[in-house]
Amino acid sequence: MPLTFHIYPPYTSTRPYSIISLFTNKRPPLNYTPQQSRFLLKTSLVTSAGAAYCWYRSYTGIAIIDGIAVLTSINYWRDPRYDWRRTMDIWWIYGCLTYHLLRAYKSQYYIGYYAITCFACSLYPFSHYYYNRGKYWNSVYLHSGLHVLANIANIVLYSGYIPPIWENPVVGFLVGV
């Protein structure tokens, strides 16, 4: 049997949820049990320590972005359903990851940051693999590892010098400088 990774968890009903379900009283099923979602909520709060350290190091823009990531994670993991809160959390985290990857370019500890981030991101498809096979605690532990490792990578990044965003050649190319 070939390995397949599904980005979205399977539905428990045959009818997928859509924008129409936002205006009805039908709610998608929980993705995890309350114990599992509390565990993931606690590990996602590690981001607040990284945001506080980032603020302490005077990288206020990055700290604000990380603070919003904490809020979107709390909003999702308090009641993890396949709905708009999940979509908002995922898209905000993708944006944060992209921003951090850009900011890390030519930073003092970019090698350590990129190495730990790559390893952390490699846990994500394995988390989905176990989720789709009904091994939810394995999925929870891998996803929690992603939370912890990604924030360790962020702390490594914040520990050194981070050049201003306008000095990044990718950003300069995009804005035409």
Residue spans for each PLM region:
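Multi-pass alpha-helical transmembrane bundles in non-GPCR membrane proteins
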Residues: P2-V177
